[in-house]
Amino acid sequence: MALVEQLLGLGHRVATSGKDCQALDTLAAQHGSRLLRLPWQLHDEDQAASACLELCHAWGALDSLIINAGATDYLPDAVSATDVFETIVSSNQLAAEHCLGQAVPLLLKGEKPQVMAIFNRYSALQLYAPTRVTAGWNNTPQWFREARQSLKNQGIDLTVVAPHSLKTPVTSAMAFPEDWTPQSAAQELLQRLPLREPELVLEVTNLSSLWPLSR
């Protein structure tokens, strides 16, 4: 929500997928047609396609795609406590794959297109056998990294924002957890967005401050 609010404040047109809430209603009233609200169930392929179709009809092109790959909105009400983390990973993996697949044609029509995928400690976990080699099929950040060259060949830059990983480190520098708020994290990410860095390390002291558990 903070990313949407700050992008609108900077004068951008923003399309967002999120559950109906008072905060989005307020932003829509303030910014009118500059805010396009899309279906939120992006882990469902049909809903992701519907969102992309709405975006295509409204704008016809997309300059930047920012994927919140740590969302908890996709958790079903009946999910058991033991399955929460695996469901966060698998549902965000589906949403990310659907979003990127649907959005590429629109990005190709955009100006200097780029993608930023943002992960937290939970959604960056490796599925199935954690001792196995990290690969795109069991780790969503790695799935994006494996897609980087293909995107680059099409003129699309990719930034992966994720916690530091001991198995697949992207930097030798230590990143210490910080007390990020939604506003400060959004401001930092938007400042880094134009730099088009391949990797950014985001360590958060309190995950629920940025990704509250939606249950």
Predicted regions mapped to residue ranges:
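A short helix-coil junction within the Rossmann-fold of NAD(P)-dependent oxidoreductases
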Residues: A58-W59, L75, Q102-E111, S150
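Catalytic loop of short-chain dehydrogenase/reductase
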Residues: L108, P113-N153, S165
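A short, exposed helix-loop element centered on a Lys and neighboring polar residues
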Residues: L100-G101, R145
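Rossmann-fold cofactor-recognition segment
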Residues: H31-D46
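C-terminal helical subdomain
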Residues: Q154-I156, V160-V161, S172-R215
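Canonical Rossmann dinucleotide-binding motif of NAD(H)/NADP(H)-dependent dehydrogenases/reductases
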Residues: M1-A15
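Conserved mid-core segment of classical short-chain dehydrogenase/reductases
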Residues: A49, G70-E86
